[in-house]
Amino acid sequence: MLRILGRRVVSASKELTSIQQWRIRPGTDSRPDPFRTFRGLQKGFCVGILPDGVDRNSEAFSSNSIAMEGILSELRSHIKKVLAGGGEEAVKRNRSRNKLLPRERIDRLLDPGSSFLELSQLAGHELYEEPLPSGGIITGIGPIHGRICMFMANDPTVKGGTYYPITIKKHLRAQEIAARCRLPCIYLVDSGGAYLPKQAEVFPDKENFGRVFYNESVMSSDGIPQIAIVLGSCTAGGAYIPAMADESVMVKGNGTIFLAGPPLVKAATGEEVSAEDLGGATVHCTVSGVSDYFAQDELHGLAIGRNIVKNLHMAAKQGMEGTFGSKNLVYKEPLYDINELRSIAPVDHKQQFDVRSIIARIVDGSEFDEFKKQYGTTLVTGFARIYGQTVGIIGNNGILFNESALKGAHFIELCSQRKIPLVFLQNITGFMVGSRAEANGIAKAGAKMVMAVSCAKVPKITIITGASFGAGNYAMCGRAYSPDFMFIWPNARIGIMGGAQAAGVLTQIERATKKRQGIKWTEEEEEAFKKKTVDAYEREANPYYSTARLWDDGVIDPCDTRKVLGLCLSAALNRPLEDTRFGVFRM
């Protein structure tokens, strides 16, 4: 479960902090009500307000509730493990050196009572033979003096904070978000550098360790502040993170920066020197000039970090003012219980549900102005507000037909022209197939929607609420289409197709191959082949398989969806919005 933290780090078993920490003042919407006349005409008829849409007495509601509780229990268990970092002994060693844990460091940088949205909390889950909690690095967004920042904090309790391939991928993803949203970067450095046994996977390629420093340089040149606080070891290539930062802080005693540590220096030159004398805070703050601020201890260093952000002079921000909601912004809570999202979301992806029941529980006042409601009905499109910010919502209500794809492309064009952020609620098994669909140009219609999604320059946020299969993933702004943020519910599945469908296709191919080769294929062998295929697809479609590899930005409790969307919108709207130019639409 993606955690939204308050002033103190909370455990996975605790509830989220209250909505008051959001700095968005609740109240009655003071905007003119265009539906007031209609509401007076017919009792009980409210234009723009979604109905409840949920039968609480249905078997589906009950079974979904039970199934989701089991799924969330598994999620909480996984999160509890990663919150423990590298284990009790590693944490004790860290404490003995008067060092805070990475989430505690972030907590002390954040504004009091504010929220922190941690990204990719389960990165590296079961990816390697040895555990690598959170991929060895904590990343996320939160405010310092009202300015939303991107935090990247090495976890020294996990393999000494060294970089595995997934650590680098997670670090680069955080930088990608920061660059796009123009968020100041806060590097909390405590790392032994690259994990040497996997040097071939972390060092030489374009998206490897060197890309971290490249991104740091490019963001600095683009006016995006790069701030490093050295709280522990900063060795070899890792030394370039603070050296290339706009401003850097070093903590006395624990913070060190050197290209080669004492053992390597002795081996290479014969010189015997301590880590502090070789590259400690005194050396780099008074002699070399590598660092700019000398901190007596961690708390002092983190306080200096807050002051650096306070003194940033950046251009005026857009939209929600970068404070997770303007203090003067007025919004309405949804009319319906957001906790019911746990009972709406099906575990069986063959079970249909109306995406409007999700929309009604995540948008302000459950108000939704639907666009083209009677046309292309398997795709729901319309305008709403989330914490006062206008958004365009695109949600699946079945497979995509020609009409629904054209409707989606039209709506994306509208939002792009008006610079309205897009929220995709993805539950899609694909496009319609068959001779009639092909003759009607399903590929052409789908291409229009994919073109629109690809070219749209407005902020795009994707939530996978159920299935995410095949080309439907593409049209609904999957990972390849660079959404600003993308999260996944724990009941979701993502893959090129469902396991049963894949087994059917591959079985036909295998049967034909064996027939050509003159090999007899028994019924038992065929069933075993099918089972093996289904099992493989189910394993690889699992949300934990996805999130471990950073195919998304985190697995979230459905009940957190509204809060996560609000935080993501706050971050995404820090950047100036560009005009959109579309490619050639095949008519």
Swiss-Prot record:
Top enzyme category: ligase
Tissue: In roots, cotyledons, leaves, flowers, ovaries, siliques and embryos.
Substrates-to-products reaction catalysed: 3-methylbut-2-enoyl-CoA + hydrogencarbonate + ATP = 3-methyl-(2E)-glutaconyl-CoA + ADP + phosphate + H(+)
Keywords annotated in UniProt: ATP-binding, Ligase, Mitochondrion, Nucleotide-binding, Transit peptide
InterPro entries recorded: AcCoA_carboxyl_beta (IPR034733), ClpP/crotonase-like_dom_sf (IPR029045), COA_CT_C (IPR011763), COA_CT_N (IPR011762), MCCB/AccD1-like (IPR045190)
Family of the protein in this entry: Belongs to the AccD/PCCB family.
Additional notes on this entry: Temporal and spatial accumulation of the alpha and beta subunits during development at approximately equal molar ratios.
Official protein name in the record: Methylcrotonoyl-CoA carboxylase beta chain, mitochondrial
Organism annotation: Arabidopsis thaliana
